[in-house]
Amino acid sequence: MLKGKSVALIAIVVMMLLFIVSCNSIKTKEEFEEELPQDVVSEGEAEDVEDKNVRETVVYYQNDAGYLVPVMRRIPWEEGIAKATLRMTIDSPEIQQDLMAMGLKALLPAGTQIRGMSIKDGLAKLDLSKEAMECENAVAEHNMVQGVALTLAEFDSIDRVQFMFEGKIVDKLKYGTDVSKPIEPQDVNLEIGSNASSKGAKVTVFFHSKPDAVYDYIVPVTRIISADSASIETAIQEVLNGPSDDSLSMDIPAGTRLLGVKTDNGVVSINFSKEFGNLAQLPQSEPLVLKSIIMTAKQFPGVEKVKILVEGKEYDGGEVSVSAFANEY
């Protein structure tokens, strides 16, 4: 009798469990639809989600001619992201392979280690291993110091860098670069223009790589000019004057003159003479020339869009939103 009651009790328990499970498995149409995969996003949305986990920042490299070249890189967010960014400037097989696609070179010599970095009140104290002192020549040494300072200054919390090597501050590096005091980012690729005076204004103008080069990029050059103050007009005129170094180029058609510059609600209209229209016949150079003009105008506050005119009429494809970065890879 007791055995029969036990069997009955077990049966009742099993039935109750089955009832509970079946109740939980019954869902409304709305509940069922909510369980369908909802995390499938479009390609653009996926990029937006991914972008939350990376920082777009400018990293400086150097080319064979000794110019510093800014490149936008996407750095995965992590604690100490400034240090992670700086690691992308160290010569290594991985970085070499990456830079090969750009035709550029790393700033910090192979074997360099970042021993430590602290940031306080805008000052980054950067401790590098002794390998960082072994740049191949004076130009590379100068580029290393300025390029690192420029790269770190892309972070709002950093405006100057105190270099240390093996935990100590040194007065000068192998080729004479003074690093005894904190380094502030200075004028990138500084040159002195023709007819300039020591009191002349500074403008940053962009030139591009040779049209027959394997790699296309634009290079900022800080030029001291004869004018007392810098303006969009004086800067664009320097673009027309072209680079002083034959390793760079500016393929604006010969005879092009600047007729005027106007600004209206963030839109800058740059009016060139009729010769500029011949740029359309240079398909390889055209995008580089246009971007060089745009980036040159961008340095001035309030510029949101650049409209390029030829004899007062809009150049085909001449209204372009201001690019955020000079070079992107």
Predicted regions and their residues:
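Bimodal "functional hotspot" detector
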Residues: 2-329
